[in-house]
């Protein structure tokens, strides 16, 4: 309807149906003229404005006159009305049809034809006539020779990182699968391009991926996304980096490639969701441990869901026995292919049941971009307990909440502690991050704080929960994150308390007796100097290095001696034992690693075993697993080079006893002090230092190893005791690379690399460490290669370079397969140098013991593969916990600083592509102070990744949530 003063003209211009135009002009007056007079005046009156006191209705009869008269009327009408409404152009139907068809052809048909012909070059692609490309017969898809992604093996996630063709769930769209269609284009924009089922294009970095299903595109597809060609119509594509360039996914690419399987998997996953939810409820009852939370490998849980028969599980007579038998043998499902719809529906069902406090956090691995474990919450102490707490607090119009709030407002904290321990526990769990997707708990806590006078206007955060806890119970733990159930410290779990009790009761005399057993099969290294280089405050000393200089032909023998705690366990010798049978080793597996946090250190093994196995006690004969290899140093005009004599590599059980005192500071001081008559100790250290530098140069030049330079790991958190003895005073230190740190790291890398090669050549199953470089776009790959080239020239990436490259770098992970570690530059990399601190090393030591005795190995390949998931899960949990604790203390420091200096401003470095006026940032001198920067609205140019933005003020801090927001002034 187009309105022009008093004239109303009704037009039908967008229908494809033929019609005869009808124009109606209506005006008001005192009387109506005859029909014949109306028809007579139509040509005079239909565009002329009439007076208010006139009443006229003018009609053109659409049923009279030949077709050419109609066309003449149309033409005359369009000519007369031209320019009445500048924003509206009136057109005839044939012209509308013609222009629509041209737009459709330019926007949709031609891009699809170009893509099909030029971007998909394969003899196996379906032969579809170009005029039938869009909405072609679906049956033709069956001719595509592509892997079926309706099921996959978990090892496929290890074999290849995120790539074009993979299906993902994104944080921004967690309810539908999308396909990765384009790789990061450059360091200035490290975002991937994803396309949803309906063709919507979105951009995100890999840390926004929640779940990944590996999938390879059909052969011959060069690209899926293409720049939208220039045409005279409005563009329909999506802008990524430049406003004058839009990108499109051709319709035929969406119909044939990107939407088919994601749509099928999503549809089946939603269909299966109610059944999967029921299965998970049943499995939870059998899997939960009343003593505390624990993590189950995610793929094991999916396998159980696939295998569980609801009819058998719900049988009144045998259902419980069926479930018990299934769960007790859950480790046997690791070889079952994972059904993709079940994988997705299990993820969705767990997300739903987190609100019922049945499942805890889903732990995501940043290398595989997949869930690898989920925390099972105890039924009685968590699920049922909080159901009762919520019911009690909500009863009688929140009467108990009102009573609690009244006591808080009156500051009667002693009464609160006596009457409301359940509310205090609720607040502690919320502050510790023990609730996930639990809207009921969040709503309840919000209601509590909205009634407390001093908090009612505050944002509801975990920080203010902890503030209230500190008011009620002043002696609360300084860092609430230590109570997180995933961290599993003794303070948060009965199960962990029991495990610690087992450790404390370890029989030292029995271990001493075992340690003093026969050493006939061990090589005694006599007076060979063993340098155990570590810090003064080291909790476990499990490695030492030695060198023998032959004084001719540049020949040296390197020795890496490693503590041998596994010799104390029967698994190292008893061939009747397959896998792990000792209680202590089972607990060590649960811990998997020594926990290092700013606040505390929790050893993986009992202290008694660590003390008995430690190296470094001068004169004490100590058992080792010793690795040795000969190297040859050659002097050339361009400098020295090193050759590793691989055939000389040996693994032996050893005895060492000569331990010269050597901390990092001692070694740096000795190496940095000129002395014309060097002592034997200094000569050894100089030889080791020289060899370690040559080993590093070789890794960089021959194997493309990546070494980070200045600015990496700045602002590491250190805690000091306050006046009351609590570790709450925060200081910061920078991790510096010195001659001593290079010496130790290169010797350990050498031992792990050579042992990985040895395991692979001798087909010994072990736990390898792997790193796979991400596939990148052409420009991004060139920038990465440029960094490698600079590193080979001795120019290591600094903080700005690291920030630019960080999103293009992958993470390392544990695997049972001898894959490459591309970051270190090793064809195989198997860790053996820290058996007191890492369970993977302990497993590999048990394999070495059996291999050296020529006995059957302790673990077969299936057992190794099943151990990978809990180990990797624990590694991810501890890595996240360490980062969260360091962030907590760093933000606490900044929070106190801003209270003292409210107008204090900071300089920050940009870490992400600016979007909607916001960008990620980091404090250059504080690695754990990361947040979001709100850019100034008047900014004409947004900063780029790696740029420094000055004069920024902190606007919000939530230390427990790790949230930091700044504004550019």
Swiss-Prot record:
One GO CC term on file: mitochondrial degradosome
Gene that this polypeptide is encoded by: DSS1
Family under the similarity heading: Belongs to the RNR ribonuclease family.
The keyword Hydrolase appears for this protein: yes
EC number in record: 3.1.13.1
Listed name of the protein: Exoribonuclease II, mitochondrial
Further details from the record: Present with 1070 molecules/cell in log phase SD medium.
Keyword entries, A-Z: Exonuclease, Hydrolase, Mitochondrion, Nuclease, RNA-binding, Transit peptide
Signal peptide (UniProt feature, chain positions): none
Classification of source organism: Eukaryota, Fungi, Dikarya, Ascomycota, Saccharomycotina
Record's subunit section: MSU1 and SUV3 are the two components of the mitochondrial degradosome (mtEXO).
Biological source species: Saccharomyces cerevisiae (strain ATCC 204508 / S288c)
Biased composition (Basic residues): 28-38
Domain of life: Eukaryota
Sequence ranges assigned to domain RNB in this UniProt record: 522-853
UniProt xrefs under SUPFAM superfamilies: Nucleic acid-binding proteins (SSF50249)
Disordered, as annotated region: 28-54
Subcellular locations according to the entry: Mitochondrion matrix
Enzyme class: hydrolase
């Amino acid at each position: 309807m187009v309105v022009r003063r008093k004239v109303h003209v009704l037009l039908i211009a967008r229908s494809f149906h033929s019609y005869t135009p009808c124009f109606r002009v209506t005006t008001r007056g005192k009387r109506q003229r005859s029909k014949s007079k109306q028809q007579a005046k139509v040509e005079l009156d239909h565009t002329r404005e009439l007076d208010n006191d006139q009443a006229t209705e003018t009609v053109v009869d659409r049923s009279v006159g030949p077709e050419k008269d109609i066309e003449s009327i149309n033409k005359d009408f369009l000519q007369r009305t031209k320019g009445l409404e500048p924003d509206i152009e009136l057109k005839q139907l044939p012209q509308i049809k013609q222009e629509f068809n041209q737009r459709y052809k330019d926007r949709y048909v031609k891009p699809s034809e170009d893509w099909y012909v030029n971007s998909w070059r394969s003899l196996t692609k379906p032969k579809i006539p170009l005029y039938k490309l869009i909405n072609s017969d679906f049956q033709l898809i069956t001719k595509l020779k592509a892997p079926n992604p309706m099921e996959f093996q978990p090892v496929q996630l290890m074999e290849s990182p995120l790539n074009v063709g993979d299906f993902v769930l994104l944080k921004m769209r967690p309810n539908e699968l999308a396909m990765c269609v384009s790789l990061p284009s450059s360091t200035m924009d490290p975002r991937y391009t994803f396309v949803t089922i309906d063709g919507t294009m979105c951009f995100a970095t890999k840390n926004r991926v929640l779940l990944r299903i590996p999938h390879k595109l059909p052969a011959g597809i060069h690209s899926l996304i293409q720049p939208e060609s220039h045409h005279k119509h409005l563009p329909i594509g999506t802008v990524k980096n430049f406003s004058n360039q839009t990108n499109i996914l051709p319709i035929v690419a969406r119909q044939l490639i990107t939407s088919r399987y994601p749509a099928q998997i999503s549809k089946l996953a939603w269909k299966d969701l109610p059944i999967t939810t029921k299965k998970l409820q049943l499995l939870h009852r059998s899997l939960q441990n009343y003593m505390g939370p624990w993590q189950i490998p995610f793929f094991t849980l999916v396998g159980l869901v696939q295998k569980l028969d609801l009819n058998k599980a719900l049988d009144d007579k045998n259902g419980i026995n069926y479930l018990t038998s299934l769960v007790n043998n859950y480790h046997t499902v690791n070889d079952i292919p994972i059904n993709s719809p079940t994988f997705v529906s299990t993820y969705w069902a767990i997300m739903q049941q987190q609100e019922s406090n049945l499942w805890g956090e889903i732990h995501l691995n940043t290398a595989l971009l997949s869930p690898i474990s989920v925390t099972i919450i105890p039924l009685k102490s968590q699920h049922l307990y909080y159901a009762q707490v919520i019911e009690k607090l909500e009863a009688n119009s929140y009467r108990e909440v009102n009573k609690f709030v009244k006591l808080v407002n009156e500051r009667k904290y002693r009464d609160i502690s006596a009457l409301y321990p359940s509310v205090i526990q609720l607040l502690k769990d919320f502050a510790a991050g023990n609730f996930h997707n639990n809207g009921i708990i969040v709503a309840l806590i919000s209601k509590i704080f909205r009634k407390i006078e001093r908090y009612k206007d505050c944002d509801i955060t975990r920080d203010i929960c902890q503030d209230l806890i500190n008011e009620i119970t002043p002696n609360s733990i300084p860092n609430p994150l230590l109570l997180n159930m995933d961290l599993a410290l003794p303070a948060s779990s009965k199960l962990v308390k029991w495990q610690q009790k087992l450790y404390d009761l370890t029989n030292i005399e029995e271990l001493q007796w075992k340690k003093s057993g026969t050493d006939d099969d061990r090589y005694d290294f006599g007076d060979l100097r063993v340098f155990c280089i570590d810090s003064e405050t080291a909790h476990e000393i499990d490695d030492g290095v030695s060198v023998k200089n032959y004084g001719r032909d540049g020949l040296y023998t390197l020795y890496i001696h490693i503590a041998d705690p596994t010799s104390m366990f029967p698994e190292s010798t008893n061939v009747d034992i397959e896998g792990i049978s000792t209680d202590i080793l089972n607990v060590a597996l649960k811990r998997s690693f020594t926990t290092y946090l700013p606040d505390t250190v929790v050893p993986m093994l009992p202290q008694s075993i660590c003390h008995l196995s430690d190296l470094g006690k001068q004169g004490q004969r100590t058992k080792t697993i010793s690795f040795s290899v000969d190297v040859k140093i050659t002097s050339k005009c361009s400098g020295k080079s090193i050759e590793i004599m691989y055939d000389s590599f040996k693994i032996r059980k050893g005895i060492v006893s000569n331990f010269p005192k050597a901390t990092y500071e001692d070694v740096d001081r000795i190496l940095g002090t000129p002395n014309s008559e060097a002592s034997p100790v200094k000569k050894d250290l100089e030889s080791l230092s020289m060899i370690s530098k040559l080993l590093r140069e070789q890794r960089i030049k021959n194997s493309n190893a990546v070494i980070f330079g200045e600015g990496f790991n700045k602002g590491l958190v250190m805690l000091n005791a306050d006046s009351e003895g609590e570790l709450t005073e925060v200081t910061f230190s920078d991790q510096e690379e010195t001659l001593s740190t290079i010496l130790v790291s290169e010797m350990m890398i050498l031992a792990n690399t050579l042992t990985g090669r040895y395991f692979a050549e001798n087909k010994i199953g072990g736990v390898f460490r792997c790193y796979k470089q991400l596939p990148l776009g052409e420009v991004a790959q060139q920038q990465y290669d440029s960094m490698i080239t600079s590193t080979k020239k001795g120019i290591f990436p600094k903080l700005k370079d690291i920030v630019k490259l960080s999103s293009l770098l992958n993470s390392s992970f544990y695997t049972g397969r001898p894959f490459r570690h591309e970051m270190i530059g090793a064809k195989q990399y198997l860790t053996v140098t820290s058996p007191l601190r890492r369970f993977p090393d302990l497993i590999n030591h048990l394999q070495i013991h059996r291999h050296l005795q020529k006995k059957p190995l302790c673990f077969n390949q299936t057992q190794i593969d099943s151990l990978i998931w809990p180990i990797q899960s624990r590694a991810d949990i501890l890595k996240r916990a360490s980062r969260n604790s360091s962030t907590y203390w760093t933000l606490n420091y900044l929070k106190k600083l801003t209270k003292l200096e409210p107008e204090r401003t900071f300089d920050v470095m940009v870490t992400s592509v600016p979007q909607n006026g916001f960008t990620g940032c980091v404090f250059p001198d504080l690695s754990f102070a990361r947040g979001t920067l709100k850019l100034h609205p008047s900014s004409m140019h947004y900063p780029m990744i790696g740029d420094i933005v000055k004069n920024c003020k902190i606007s919000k801090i939530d230390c427990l949530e790790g949230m930091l927001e700044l504004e550019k002034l």
